[in-house]
């Protein structure tokens, strides 16, 4: 029965050859697609983490335009120091007046007076209608405030 052995051997050989070919090609393409998919997901994840970290750093350091706009809104308006020397009436909040704002006066008593006005006006028990007052600078006369 050599004929049966030959057929059997031929079928077995063909079967092994097909199996071997399928395994190699399937394994190679599967690892290639898995590697490409894995690297793509890994790259997207790294980019996402970097974008989030960069955004947080910008928010913390105040480098984002929205942060700067919020910081400008939170600051109160202060008059420039030179405008205190003019005779034009000024409208500003007296709570924001500090000694550093008054640089053009030569009389130290006027600085002390304005500092006292600042401490009185910034007291929290005042009614809300006095939050912003029109202020016109005048000459300091001790008799007017005693």
UniProtKB/Swiss-Prot annotation:
Any one of the GO CC terms: host cell membrane
Keywords: Host membrane, Membrane, Transmembrane, Transmembrane helix
Bilayer-spanning residue ranges: 36-56
Keyword Transmembrane: yes
Domain of life from the UniProt record: Viruses
Name the UniProt record assigns to this protein: Non-structural protein 5
Membrane topology: Single-pass membrane protein
Species in which this protein is naturally found: Aquareovirus C (isolate Golden shiner/USA/GSRV/1977) (AQRV-C)
Major localisation: host cell
Recorded family membership: Belongs to the aquareoviridae NS5 protein family.
Keyword Cell membrane tagged: no
Compartmental location: Host membrane
Gene: S7
């Amino acid at each position: 029965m050599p004929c049966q052995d030959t057929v059997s051997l031929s079928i077995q050989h063909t079967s092994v050859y097909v199996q071997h070919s399928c395994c190699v090609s399937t394994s190679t393409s599967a690892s290639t697609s898995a590697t490409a998919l894995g690297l793509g997901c890994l790259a997207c994840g790294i980019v996402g983490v970097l974008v989030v970290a960069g955004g947080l750093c910008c928010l913390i350091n105040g480098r984002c335009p929205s942060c700067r706009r919020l910081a400008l809104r939170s600051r109160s308006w202060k008059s420039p120091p030179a405008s205190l020397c003019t005779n034009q009436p000024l409208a500003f909040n007296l709570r924001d007046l500090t000694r550093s704002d008054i640089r053009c006066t030569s009389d130290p008593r006027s600085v002390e007076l304005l500092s006292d006005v600042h401490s009185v006006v910034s007291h929290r028990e005042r009614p809300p209608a006095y939050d912003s007052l029109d202020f016109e600078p005048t000459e300091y006369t001790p008799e007017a405030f005693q």
